Amino acid sequence: DNADLFPDPASRFQPKGPHGPSQIINPQVFRWTDHDWRGVTIPGQIIYELHIGTFTAEGTYESAISKLPHLKRTGITVVELMPLAEFSGCFGWGYDGVDLFAPSHLYGTPDDLRAFVDAAHKTGLGVILDVVYNHLGPDGNYLKQYSADYFTEKATEWGEAINFDGPNSLPVREFFLSNVEYWIREFHMDGLRLDATQSIFDSSDEHILAAIARTAHNAADGRATIVTAENEPQHARLARPVDQGGYGLDALWNDDFHHSALVALTGHKEAYYQDHSGAPQEFISAAKYGFLFQGQRYDWQKKPRGTPTRGVTPSAFVNFVENHDQVANGGRGARLHQRTSSGRYRAMTALLLLAPGTPLLFQGQEFQSSAPFLYFAEHKAELARAVAKGRREFLAQFPSLATPEMVACFPDPASEETFMRCKLDWSELDKNQQALQMIKDLLSLRREDPAFAAQASGKIDGAVLGPNAFLLRYFLEDEQDRLLIVNLGTDLELARAPEPLLAPPENKTWRLLWSTENPVYGGCGTPNPDTDNGWRFPGESALVLAPGDLQPQAPNPQGTAS
């Protein structure tokens, strides 16, 4: 009955939501079995982003455990959980969390989450958690009731920014850094993904991002941990070692790869896609250098974007063609395979999974799920109307989505139906075995073939072969090079090939090693592209070529002149 009662700001559990009482949790009760788990480092990882509430029909930590063996068999190595901090309403993406230490009660208890992580480690999978340290949600945020010092007058597009460098900011920094330690120590997380770091403001001698990375790396008592981040301005400094003037994060999301891929596959160049053409050179440059914009003018923002990436390891760029934001930003939540041809989608998937960066798949992508991923967030009526209005205004940057006809089709974010539509239909796993088999084979090739496993940008080069076709050559010291040919256009014939990257190693010829046109994947078959009359690359396909021995020439039946 006392209106001045508030939840504990460091509550470990809110069983009745962010407005209810805080439950005392003993973190020592759970019996871990992952004592031999040594953690993860970024090289060699395959990340899988999932939302607990829509990953299974039940939408719980416990039910998600049953899918871990499938992820392992597919070739996934790290599960990335969308934010779990307690938020208001019965469903939401999680980016409006308010109780940073309390895993959402909607998905189970804190020990249920521990059981999920423990099971993942037993299966051979790492787990990292998406955390939001740039703002807190609009409903259920009681931190100001304890101190106004948590926030600053600086604004983000989602609300007040966190005070990491202003008056009385030291306890604020300690609060958030203790949250970093909490997830890694008490839940055995293998690292964190930091949301929208461009909206984390700090002028301290040690930037809070560097402090977060340092804390995360030191918190695991000998286990290896990783810290990845979203950084829209593409500041490569975040992923440089501290002794080189960087912040010491392990990897950054690479929006450039996604934007070029979407333009190439759909032809749409609206809003923040307008600076990308989807041309072959963009993919060659992405494979060699990571970010495409490294200080050039970015017309969409009317200013330079990005910083040079020289010296940043290739595994520090997280590449994707789908994630939660980009699928939802299509307006109707359609998956990318639904917006292009099957051949082109297979070819782009091959590039994603064989390029030197760290690939990320979004839930259901491995079996071409038909479930959309829409923006959903349940709030009280007035706030729900404001959220829906804000979503419409955000999508209005895309002219095709700003028409009255399209606006009328937008799902209501606060509707339970919108949320339920996003749940994966796991019966599609059996129906779409061709798509799944291709992902499995690609990840096996990436893992077992030395050329792809190396993730070495210094040992890769590329060439444009046509308006929609290009090659990447992966160099190995023993001349066991690999050629990845990607053709997003029609059949391409090259009678002459004055391109040295097409030349096989000495005394070798090229043999077809792998193709997206394998009938096992739904393709139409692939003749050897290197013919007596030149090269012939099938349209809408990707091929991997490996050196093979030359066939001995048949003896000349006419003999030789004496």
Regions from the language model: what does each represent?
Residues P9, P15, F30-I47, H51-I226, ...:
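Substrate-binding/active-site clefts of carbohydrate-active enzymes
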Residues H51-T56, A85, S104, Y133, ...:
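Short, flexible loop/turn elements at secondary-structure junctions
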Residues D1-Y48, A57, I65-T74, A334, ...:
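Carbohydrate-interacting/catalytic domains
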Residues L209, A213-E405, R447, Q480, ...:
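Conserved alpha/beta catalytic core and glycan-binding cleft of carbohydrate-active enzymes
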Residues H51, V98-D99, L192-Q198, G330-R335, ...:
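Glycine- and acidic
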Residues P83, S104, D130-V131, G166, ...:
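Active-site proximal loops enriched in glycine and acidic residues that flank catalytic Cys/His/Asp
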Residues H121, N163, F176, E181, ...:
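Hydrophobic alpha-helix feature that most strongly marks membrane-spanning transmembrane helices
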